[in-house]
Amino acid sequence: MKASMFLALAGLVLLFVVGYASESEEKEFPRELLSKIFAVDDFKGEERGCKGFGDSCTPGKNECCPNYACSSKHKWCKVNLGK
């Protein structure tokens, strides 16, 4: 039952995309649509001045972002709970 509902929904979505693509004047629409669906986050490539949650760090160097602290036991940035 669940599989048939999923297939019906997927078929409707596919029908909508194909119908919209056929009405589109641009011939690059399917490629453009796929690139937007599977786009990679651009901000992940940017470097920060500090390290976020789970990044490796050296205790005592204050490398972690605000609200994070370098764990001396595990040597990675974790949430600073004020202890």
From Swiss-Prot:
The keyword Manganese does not apply. Expressed by the venom gland. Residues 1-21 form the signal peptide. Residues 22-48 form a propeptide. It holds the Pfam family Toxin_12. It is found in: Secreted. The modification Leucine amide is found at residue 81. One of its GO terms (cellular component) is host cell presynaptic membrane. One of its GO terms (molecular function) is sodium channel regulator activity. Disulfide bonds join 50-65, 57-70, 64-77. It comes from the Eukaryota. InterPro entries: Huwentoxin-1, Huwentoxin_CS1. Keywords: Amidation, Disulfide bond, Ion channel impairing toxin, Knottin, Neurotoxin, Presynaptic neurotoxin, Secreted, Signal, Toxin, Voltage-gated sodium channel impairing toxin. Monomer. The presence of a 'disulfide through disulfide knot' structurally defines this protein as a knottin. Lethal neurotoxin. Selectively blocks tetrodotoxin-sensitive voltage-gated sodium channels (Nav). Does not affect tetrodotoxin-resistant voltage-gated sodium channels or calcium channels. Belongs to the neurotoxin 10 (Hwtx-1) family. 15 (Hntx-3) subfamily. This is Mu-theraphotoxin-Hhn2i.
